Amino acid sequence: DEIVVNIQGDEPLMPAEAVNQTAALLADRPECAVATAAHTLTSIEDFFSPNVVKVELDNRGNALTFSRAPIPWPRDAFRKDQTKLPEGFRLLHHLGLYAYRVGFLKKFPTLAPAPIEEAESLEQLRALWNGEKIAVLVLHQALPAGVDTEEDLERVRAVFASRQ
């Protein structure tokens, strides 16, 4: 099955290395229909922001769920302090980078939207709802921020202007 990669428009500075690694992950994981990428959350503001999609993984590195809400919720740690990220938890920011098997892409439009997909406005939840596996590459290199706000857009415009 061929693999197609999609970089969402809000990730204009996605490094080619991350794209290649995500496609390679899907090629190495025949049980998965999709692969995507994430990196460690580093700010409490991002953890609480609904513009930053979070992902939680199983013990094989596949997505359990995606959410705009703060997940996982370290209950006891946040009872003490909600001003900084708690230590000892893997808090992941999902990136708008996907690798798909062509066969799955053909099937995807025929799948009914999931209630959680409609609530969160996250189409990848439809794949999970319908029993598909999504492999997640956790990137450890520093990544340029995506575009979620007007300020982000201005920052990215400045990057592109500096490259001309």
Where are the regions that the model predicts?
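Proteins with a high burden of low-complexity, intrinsically disordered sequence enriched in S/T/G/P/A and R
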Residues: D1-E2, E120
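Conserved alpha/beta core of the MobA/IspD/sugar-nucleotide pyrophosphorylase nucleotidyltransferase superfamily
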Residues: K80-Q164
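Short aromatic/hydrophobic "clamp" motif used to bind/position activated sugar donors
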Residues: V4-N6
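Short active-site-adjacent helix-start/loop capping segments
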Residues: L13-P15, A145-G146
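Residue-level signal for threonine
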Residues: D1, T42-S43, T149
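Short, high-confidence coil segments that cap the C-terminus of an alpha-helix
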Residues: D1, R29-C32, E132
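Conserved core of the sugar-phosphate nucleotidyltransferase
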Residues: M14-A114
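Short acidic donor-binding/metal-coordinating loop in glycosyltransferase active sites
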Residues: G9-E11
